[in-house]
Amino acid sequence: MTDEPSRKRRILLRSGKSPFDVASLEQSLHRDVFATNAGNLIFSDAAHKILTTPRAEVFSNGIRTDPSAAERINEEYDAFVVPLANAFRPTFERPLKRMTQLIKKLRIPVVVLGVGAQASLTYDASRLKPMEPTVREFVTEVLNRSASIGVRGEFTEQYLKDMGFRDVEVIGCPSMFLNGDTFRVEKKTEALTADSLISVNGSHSAVRVHGLDSIIRQAHERYPHLRFIGQNLLEAQLLHWRETSNPIGAQTSMPTHPSHPMYREGKVRLFVDPVTWIDELRAYDFSFGSRIHGNIAALLAGVPSTVLCSDSRTLELCRYFGIPHRKITDTPKDIDPADLYAAADFGELVNGHKERFLRFTGFMERNGLENTFTHGDGGAAFDAQLGKLSFPPAVRPWIDSDPESLSGRFSWMQSRMEELNAQNTMLRSQLDRRSGPVSIKVQAGDGAAAWPSAYRRARRVVGRPVRKLLRPEQ
């Protein structure tokens, strides 16, 4: 695009959805708006706010990469900004390749706003060696379109420098700069008690491999007001539908599994929007666990937090920002959250925040990006717009059968069935036009003929208890 003095700069942001996109719980889960992990929205929403200035508009591109959209992006946008988490990991190699293919076709600046490599707590990068050509190609294409690449911490910086790259800057994660150059965290009480409201979080791997299940179980016994905050799509599906097609969801030691005591007691939550997530946590006294953005959400709410680091991605971020943390491998399995709370010191986090903020915004300026705190209203308009919207509540365990809890689920399923029937009608019409009459029974309409296709498609998005209700009579 060509710049015009009176035209706002149009920035395309890689994010699951716009912060102002309000969807029902069912729609959010069906669309997977947080790209399997709600923590992604914490840093993408922060990036959206930071990039919004009087001279720039921000647009969400979605998470799925489409290289064929390159020409449209070149024509419609002035820059492509890509906040990433642990993108340098084997399981993300294919999406990283697709992103590289897109970037190769772009003629506009491409700025990576924080990316991390994932390895062990010992910073051993040997597991990343097989994907080194993919990482090298990605970073090369990014640096061909920007002054430098922003990384999350010391490990990723060294990883790229060992590959020969020099234009690498440690900037942390945009999420920590949601509120600008100040950061406030306050211990509301001298010590935790049985009456304290505590949040715990953790991944399936931390529970399965590192014994986090034992820590959670004992904390649950000690603290009646303990709540587990989930983040993954499969956890949301288990909470809302009591079932997921993902085999990892069968792990019964996770509080998001229907057989877990915390699930049965209704002590599990999952938020699909950062604004409700952070607002909910303001009432808590403490947060701990292995999820970095689960604990960053609490810190942004002003709540003391401690991260139990299980890999390099969480460890390097905690070290950079001065977030209280422990290696989960060195943490006793009977640790009391009260001990973590007492040991947590936020001096480094708070006192060094402004310097880190200036480093972050300096990186942005060197890459041609303005920020709302220096060049705008500090996010006031952004926050005001969010405040006018009504976001859905947290996803909670489905442990009751009252009409109110069922109405939203069945209303959504009815609308999905109508959509599927309409699609079937359209497909039948297209088939008729192209090849004449067909004998397959996929059309919409009354009676059993309409059921097989619609039922098979609807069953993929709901749990077994609901599928039984939807199953046509034989």
PLM region spans:
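Active-site anion-handling motifs in enzyme catalytic cores
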Residues: 1-470
